[in-house]
């Protein structure tokens, strides 16, 4: 920074250029200091507008603290002075504008993890400096982070910051930006320095995802989501990124990671000492630099034209640094542009806190003018025309609405819908074969094929035999190298193919939501944490079941398969409480193993623990079955409503030798009477109780149970997990696809001869193990 004396102390010592922003009570201009010939930003606060507002103490406090701050990551206030009409703040000019606008207009994409780590490191350094002086910023957001000409991040807008007398001092004022405000602030609870850590977590999420974690169309709904900590981390982020976001966005402020720990987190260590080095077209002299040079000030309420995404502003005393915040935001600047990128208007709520009555002596601060009384509310200024930027904003909306897909660890599978056949093949490629009915050929044909690499970056569009298409085959069509193939990457995929990519990404997301990443056997249940890290399934040994997903929330089923709609009941509470413990434990297991992974050596999928063994006295086992039925006692039922067809009537352990004996005798009678191989399908078996069971070539099993035996359908996946579906229940598409073979199977079973030997065959009744099953069609839907 240039010495203090190099800056003029009257407005006549500056060459005031064009307007950068205009807001509630101040205007910001680009200017050139005639002494130093340095470009600066001048914020001119109109004294007439702030008279009687009662906010003068805030600004005096803000300026007093800001003028004492000096750090590379904090926007600099060079000097200030006043005359009869205005208070002037001479501020550092950040040439590349606010970070959020830079991401949307210049990069047109979220930041990479390495880029985000570089930004985060600078922000954390700045906050460590502020917190070391007991200064709480309270409004860290993407719009309050500015980029200098050399791409260094500057913390700006200290309009809500406050000076704490000690690090553990607490405040009660509700203030901040809704998308970044912490739960304790929204709830009007006491809050301190950890409130800034929550904002840092929201900032990191926004850097990596491109939108804030709690973003909605209305302020109130956003605040509701904040209070509930209702957010979802996309699965495409690395484990380290997800873990750091999770540690920053802890609802309990005492559980949040500290700033020092952020710098030592694996996410930061992995990124190393990287710096921001993105290419840019440079900020324009008018519009671009205004993003950098705005200052916050204090306003009451001003909504922009786009969304009800506002800024919460407290009337509490501001005791903090850098008054070089972005004026365009808080003054309603560039309202028409903000609606396209990061709608943040100014919205302030009066505070219950009182201000220190001590006033700052402007002359004591090196100024020869009377004390300033400033801050008020005024009309937002009209936007400055910027056609080039406006065009860039329009273009920014044109991008694929999903991040690059990733099929890492997903098993090959093939799945058919009405309009397409979706597959994940052995090399991880996603293949979408689009189907169209050809009336001339009287059949459906494959008319378009989209192949996407496992990392989602390469896309091949192919039209086989144009005009005719290909017949539908049992296996995914091979790649045809021809001049008609169109090869693209994720960044240059034409918009006409975006729907294909989104279709594939949703399919991969569905597969992830049904593919276990961590299988954990607790004392009460078998647990599956799915690959997307959000879907969770609990199959209690008692027969109860619990599922958890972002789309459907928590569903609880009792031992009879009936959904418990009242989750406040004692039974539901018990199941939910145990599931929460297991979910947290599975996440911890996953986190630990992620850290242990090196390169391509993956630890997943992983199974932890084993099913508890239930001892049964020999006297309770009927003669002749003691050696063949031990497994029935050691393996309780794992899924709600599932049926173990090796001993089909045993669903749970009960006391009493008579009851157990009768169950086992009934099971002994349910033996195979017919069996045959169906080409292209698998092995079909009819049991003596009327159950028809089809074991498919992928190891999965479909069992159709007659009404006399309880009715319904049981689907056993190739990994041994079974699910029972009652009659008239909605069936997953994978089950319906397998059931489509049933008429053919039943017809052949009618003609099949009876098995001559009635010997109980346990192997025929169980699904093949995953190890021996073929590689295809293992999707768990």
From Swiss-Prot:
It holds the Pfam family Plk4_PB1. One of its GO terms (molecular function) is protein serine kinase activity. Residues 397-514 form the Cryptic POLO box 1 (CPB1) domain. Residues 14-268 form the Protein kinase domain. It is found in: Cytoplasm, Cytoskeleton, Microtubule organizing center, Centrosome, Centriole. ATP binds at residues 20-28, 43. Ubiquitinated by the SCF(Slimb) ubiquitin ligase complex; leading to its degradation by the proteasome during interphase and regulating centriole number and ensuring the block to centriole reduplication. Its EC number is 2.7.11.21. Keywords: ATP-binding, Cytoplasm, Cytoskeleton, Kinase, Nucleotide-binding, Serine/threonine-protein kinase, Transferase, Ubl conjugation. It catalyses: L-seryl-[protein] + ATP = O-phospho-L-seryl-[protein] + ADP + H(+); L-threonyl-[protein] + ATP = O-phospho-L-threonyl-[protein] + ADP + H(+). InterPro entries: Kinase-like_dom_sf (IPR011009), Plk4-like_POLO_box_2_sf (IPR047108), POLO_box_dom (IPR000959), POLO_box_Plk4_1 (IPR033699), POLO_box_Plk4_2 (IPR033698), POLO_box_Plk4_C (IPR033696), Prot_kinase_dom (IPR000719), Protein_kinase_ATP_BS (IPR017441). SUPFAM superfamilies: Polo-box domain, Protein kinase-like (PK-like). Residues 463-486 are annotated as: Disordered. The keyword Kinase applies. Homodimer. This is Serine/threonine-protein kinase PLK4. The gene is SAK.
